[in-house]
């Protein structure tokens, strides 16, 4: 029906705006003791609204801390539990969740951290948050298995007629900061931590850019360091480039055979597809 898609989009946008305003009404009441926004008063009777609002006040901070802490575990460890709780509450206030699944909330958190004045002394924190988010999203991505038979296309087709398909949720993060080194230091046992954090301090003293690929191995998302050619190659694949174009973007320093071996062992690759265009 002509115009049906437009009407559906308008309805969805209206619902999103309505939910955002509802969350902000609750947050406004949460922040100002004894107040209740007009829109909320109109939707709820006095006693019922007061009880619901009190429950919201009691639980919102804990909910925000748990939800963001699950997705941004490294950042939480870096800033400390108390400071992270304050950040989570502040973020909830400005970017309230719009869906019931709080696992989907927080995609704006890295960018929000990058603009936060109090975090200016930690210029690498936002990129660490981006890595945390990539790991979180990867573990929530759809399951998939390697189409091993499709690898035979590499022997029978011109590279310009093939595309490599990465596993769902595979992510690429490139940073001017040593994000892989920082992340690693926060994952290891306490008896090895001193040496790992010394490496972090050295890396931050002379900032070294690092690129990582995030892929799930079994049930856990894993961080894999990439060099420059590997990162350029991976970005081309994520952009949908054919094999020939991706090889050109990676440059002469790229070792395709070596990458393919890592991709198969690390479960990065879903399969090879012949281009239809």
Language-model features and meaning:
Residues 94-221, 225-228:
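Hydrophobic packing positions characteristic
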Residues 72, 157-159, 236, 262:
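Preference for short coil/turn "hinge" residues that link or interrupt alpha-helices
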Residues 219-277:
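C-terminal structured interaction module
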Residues 1-2, 213:
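N-terminal cationic amphipathic segment used for targeting or macromolecule association
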Residues 2-145:
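N-terminal, charged low-complexity regulatory/assembly segments
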């Amino acid at each position: 029906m002509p115009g049906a898609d437009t009407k559906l989009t308008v309805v969805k946008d209206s619902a999103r705006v309505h939910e955002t305003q509802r969350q902000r009404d609750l947050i406004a009441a949460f922040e100002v003791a004894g107040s209740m926004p007009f829109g909320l008063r109109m939707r709820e009777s006095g006693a019922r609204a007061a009880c619901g609002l009190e429950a919201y006040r009691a639980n919102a901070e804990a909910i925000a801390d748990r939800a963001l802490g699950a997705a941004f575990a490294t950042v939480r460890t870096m800033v400390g539990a108390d400071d992270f709780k304050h950040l989570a509450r502040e973020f909830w206030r400005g970017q309230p969740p719009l869906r019931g699944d709080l696992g989907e909330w927080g995609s704006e958190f890295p960018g929000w951290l990058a603009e936060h004045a109090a975090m200016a002394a930690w210029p690498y924190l936002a990129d660490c948050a981006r890595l945390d988010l990539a790991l979180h999203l990867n573990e929530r991505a759809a399951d998939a298995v390697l189409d091993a038979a499709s690898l035979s296309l590499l022997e029978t087709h011109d590279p310009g007629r093939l595309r490599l398909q990465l596993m769902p949720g595979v992510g690429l993060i490139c940073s001017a900061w040593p994000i892989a080194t920082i992340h690693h230091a926060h994952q290891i046992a306490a008896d090895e931590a001193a040496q790992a954090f010394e490496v972090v301090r050295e890396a931050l003293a002379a900032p070294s850019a690092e690129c990582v690929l995030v892929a799930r191995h079994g049930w856990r998302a894993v961080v894999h360091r990439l060099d420059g050619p590997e990162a350029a190659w991976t970005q081309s694949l994520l952009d949908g480039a054919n094999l020939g174009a991706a090889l050109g973007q990676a440059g002469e320093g790229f070792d395709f055979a070596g990458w393919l071996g890592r991709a198969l062992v690390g479960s990065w690759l879903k399969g090879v597809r012949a281009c239809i265009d």
